[in-house]
Amino acid sequence: MDRITDFYFLDFRESVKTLIITGNSWRLQEMIDRFFTNISNFNRESLTEIQNIQIEEIAVNLWNWAVTKRVELSVRKNQAAKLCYIACKLVYMHGISVSSEEAIQRQILMNIKTGKEWLYTGNAQIADEFFQAAMTDLERLYVRLMQSCYTEANVCVYKMIVEKGIFHVLSYQAESAVAQGDFKKASMCVLRCKDMLMRLPNMTKYLHVLCYNLGIEASKRNKYKESSFWLGQSYEIGKMDRRSVEPQMLAKTLRLLATIYLNCGGEAYYTKAFIAILIANKEHLHPAGLFLKMRILMKGNSCNEELLEAAKEILYLAMPLEFYLSIIQFLIDNKRESVGFRFLRIISDNFKSPEDRKRILLFYIDTLLQKDQDMIAEEKIKDVLKGYQTRSRLSRDLVNWLHNILWGKASRSVKVQKYADALHWYSYSLKLYEYDKADLDLIKLKRNMVSCYLSLKQLDKAKEAIAEVEQKDPTHVFTRYYIFKIAIMEGDAFRALQVVSALKKSLMDGESEDRGLIEAGVSTLTILSLSIDFALENGQQFVAERALEYLCQLSKDPKEVLGGLKCLMRIILPQAFHMPESEYKKKEMGRLWNYLNTALLKFSEYFNEAPSTLDYMVNDANWFRKIAWNLAVQSEKDLEAMKNFFMVSYKLSLFCPLDQGLLIAQKTCLLVAAAVDLDRGRKAPTICEQNMLLRTALEQIKKCKKVWNLLKKTGDFSGDDCGVLLLLYEFEVKTKTNDPSLSRFVDSVWKMPDLECRTLETMALLAMDKPAYYPTIAHKAMKKLLLMYRKQEPVDVLKYSVCMHNLIKLLVADEVWNISLYPLKEVQSHFKNTLSIIRQNEGYPEEEIVWLMIKSWNIGILMSSKNKYISAERWAAMALDFLGHLSTLKTSYEAKVNLLYANLMEILDKKTDLRSTEMTEQLRALIVPPEDQGSVSSTNVAAQNHL
């Protein structure tokens, strides 16, 4: 084992050399992972032939390569961490002597570096292992240094070296503890570092920043109490050395601390927040600090005077006008309008330039409109427009701001359905455009006005406005939408369809969408959806149908497509259900089938894409499944359509949760579909088409068998014929297609313990139904059937007679004059059994007795022609036995049969050569032509009747 380990290590050593020499090998990641996995297999005892110096050399080379080449060779962080891990483990192998303080210091450095690599790759537990090793090495270093020093000065220097190392390790352990959620350990490490700052003052800023960053991370995770601790420590540590930590940084820390206290809520935290912001503003006055002070005062429900005084403090900072306006907006938004307006008057005295005064006036107008003080605002607007028209023109950005103010007010009016008010405010914006002669957003303004006119049912004004818009921006999606709405309101379906077609074309051509509309969540498809809603609301179903078809065709959103298909089907279904049978109804049903298939396709594409969509997908699948079922029921006069709808219903059911009701529906769908394809297969004009239909039926039968097996586990279905029907359907398909598995299938059927008579009856018929021809199967089925009939009490002589007739007809053909082809012993046994049944039961059909009598007589004649005298006499005597059981027909046959019997006996008594031509003719004269009065219907008809 040791030699195997040596071999692995030698291979490892060569690989390290190769890695260092070749640099970025294409197998770099594979090699690093292999080294990392195998390092645990190496220990000092196993490496008997490797010297310590060699191991140490490999470790140092690998370390240096990992550190220096990481950036150059794009070694990922986790790979670099693994390389450092390997190097450290090699250095720490048992038995390697630490000969100097430099060696221990190198180990400390390697441990700290490796721990940091693992910490920053997200594996804090491995990092802790190396930090602890570094701490142990620091203790060893301290002992070694104390043993080797001889002066007090040296002792101080050595202590400083060790303490600095301990400080760094503790800080990294704190970060690791935070990463693992161990706040207690992290805080203990930081407090130990804080205690060491008196001896390490140059580390103050480092620890201050560390605590600040830990506070930010805790606040991101909503751990406000932990965050407040770290930020508090950051401020206290920063105060310890004001030369290294600037007042701006201390103030920033306190502002964040105040914000954290504010988020905690409660009176106590409010007080702490207020104290923190006061100290922050004292450390370094900043607009953010003054603004935060106002927020805290607002939170504490301070009086208006306190708020105003806090606002006035900001004036000393000489900030831009926009900053002061944001303060006023903040006050107004928090229901302190009186303070806001008072402060607005104060700043208006401080900003005396014409541009600033105009900006303050527009802000005042906007504020008045937000607070619904419309009359005062309107007077100010008129003053602005009058001044703008005569002498005091506004700059471009102020003009745009005024437009935005007016449009904002109009938009708020539209939201509460005050369309006349909205038009009123839009009219001021229109006047401003007239004065300005600019055409920046005039088209958009006109469209907004069209929307209001339409809502007010003012069609003439809407048409006049949209005509101007159409001239300048005819392809804009909202231009088309308003033209569409006007057409619908006027009942112009042709014009509305033109717009819908234009929307479809723009979608198919991939015309670029307006960026502003996209950001607002409006697209051409959205407008198409709105057009559909508007058409339906106004009774234009034909237009809505066309638009819905385009939507389903072009949308990529499965929810939107399914919604469109549901809407389409809700429109068409009532009409289709009440239509008389016609080509038009057939066409409409075809449309519905296409819609269902489109829905099925969407379910197949998107059902498993996102779990969040599952609920609505399941509900929609169930809805479409039921619709397909109802359409199948409606199509009972068109078997192919009925089958198609049932199959779609089945496929849609696969996206619904299974229960007993759903399994019953699936069973019915597949059973009916198989029956329809079987029926069509029987009537198919060509063998090729027949085989195709029968194979399709077989696929459906197999699926139905699986469903049936699941369904039987959910309850008692002993009265359900599904199992029998599936057996017969599968048998018919296999016989008609000459399936090679038929033999195995039939063998399994014979072994079934609960075969019913009607199943065997149908199997016997189907086995001989063209193109099937399996007399052996029919023979066995009828034998089993006769046995079952005989066991019944009382015997059903009618069914028995039919089965016996068919069996004898199968065994003894009328036209074959060859005794060797008949199983006469079996036939004779069946005849005897029949005579026994006739004797013991009443009601055996006389026509069948006559038929058996004639068949027995003719077999006797056949036997005599072959010089089988005894057998001939026996068969003839059996014919007389059948004659004896006749009643009403006895008189018709008795004389003739007795005469024939006497003639036969005379011929047999002479014992002449029956094979002579003369004698053959005499025997043929004795044959009675069969009177097949008891024949049954064809197997094909029987099979159809069974379906």
Curated annotation (Swiss-Prot):
Tissue spec. comment: Testis-specific.
Misc: Represent the only meiosis-specific factor encoded by the chromosome X in mouse.
GO biological process annotation, one example: reciprocal meiotic recombination
Disulfide bonds: none
Broad class of where this protein is predominantly found: nucleus
Protein name (database record): Testis-expressed protein 11
Summary of subunit composition and partner proteins: Interacts with SYCP2. Interacts with PBXIP1; may prevent interaction between PBXIP1 and ESR2. Interacts with SHOC1. Interacts with REDIC1.
Phenotype caused by lack of the gene: Defects in meiotic double-strand breaks (DSBs) repair and reduced crossover formation. However, discrepancies exist between the different reports. According to a report, deletion induces male sterility. Females are fertile with reduced litter. Adult mice show an arrest in male meiosis and aberrant chromosome segregation in anaphase spermatocytes. Chromosomal asynapsis and reduced crossover formation are observed, leading to elimination of spermatocytes at the pachytene and anaphase I stages.
Subcellular localization, as worded in the UniProt entry: Chromosome
Its biological purpose: Regulator of crossing-over during meiosis. Involved in initiation and/or maintenance of chromosome synapsis and formation of crossovers.
InterPro entries: Spo22/ZIP4/TEX11, TEX11, TPR-like_helical_dom_sf
GO CC annotation, single: chromosome
Gene3D superfamilies for the chain: Tetratricopeptide repeat domain (1.25.40.10)
Species: Mus musculus
Keyword field: Chromosome, Meiosis
Family the UniProt entry places it in: Belongs to the SPO22 family.
